[in-house]
Amino acid sequence: MCDGDCRPLGFLLGLPFAFLSLLLSIIGVIIWIVGLLLSCICPCCLCVTVLVEIAIGLIKAPIHVMEWFMSKIPC
């Protein structure tokens, strides 16, 4: 059916969701910076490591949302 991964309609429809994900990733960056500072102060806290991992997931959210949304749109 489709010979390529070019789905401009899916890209355009996914832009509002990507914008919301971008806001989440900005929050993730803030959490990541705070988590890194806390882990430098007290490296024995395991919960800070989990917090940093969640923040990294939030930072990658816009890319995952756009890929997911574009994969749902047929050619």
Swiss-Prot record:
Q: Where primarily located?
A: secreted
InterPro entries on file? TAXIMIN_1/2
* A GO CC term attached to the entry: extracellular space
UniProt keywords (A-Z) are: Developmental protein, Secreted, Signal, Stress response
UniProt keyword Signal present:
yes
Location in the cell: Secreted
What is the top-level taxon of the source organism?
Answer: Eukaryota
Phenotype upon loss of function: No visible phenotype.
Expression sites by tissue: Expressed in shoot apical meristems (SAM); mostly specific to the L1 layer in the center of the meristem but also detected in the L2 layer in organ primordia. Also observed in the vasculature of seedling roots.
Regulation of activity? Counteracted by the antibiotic cefotaxime during responses to light stress.
Q: Which GO terms describe its biological process?
A: fruit morphogenesis; organ boundary specification between lateral organs and the meristem; response to light stimulus
Signal peptide bounds: 1-29
What's this protein's function?
Signaling peptide involved in the regulation of lateral organs separation, including fruits and leaves. Involved in the perception of and response to light stress via the control of sinapoyl-malate accumulation, a UV-B protecting compound.
The molecule here is called: Signaling peptide TAXIMIN 1
Organism, per UniProt?
Arabidopsis thaliana
Give me the gene this protein comes from.
Answer: TAX1
